[in-house]
Amino acid sequence: MAQSGPMLAYRHAFHAGNHADVLKHLVLVSVLRHMAQKEKGFRVVDTHAGAGGYSLESRYARQKAEYAAGIERLYDAADLPPALADYVAQVRAFNGDGALKQYPGSPAIARMLLRPQ
């Protein structure tokens, strides 16, 4: 099948922290927490992971500001369900100073939640 037009490059920085990232990373945090409860060692392989972190102040993130409908809506929310609160806590830990300026990618989240084997 012939392609109709130029192939556009995908740059995740435009989409970092959006609703899809929130869902993927919420599941990732929950799965890693569950796996870490077991004594047996485990590996994390993410075939679709992007960068370890993204600046939400970058021109890419600000251009579409998709994070505003994703992580930004949850970041200061109170009374979140436990799994969602745990995920947001990981994003907060990644930011250090409290302000939402950075968004962790899957590699950073996995690294934060791994334990010694």
For each of these PLM feature ranges, what is it?
Residues 2-39, 59-64, 68:
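Class I SAM-dependent methyltransferase Rossmann-like catalytic core
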Residues 42-43, 51-117:
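Class I S-adenosyl-L-methionine-dependent methyltransferase module
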Residues 17, 47-49:
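Glycine-rich His-Gly loop
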Residues 38-46:
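Gly/serine-rich nucleotide phosphate-binding loop at the start of the catalytic core
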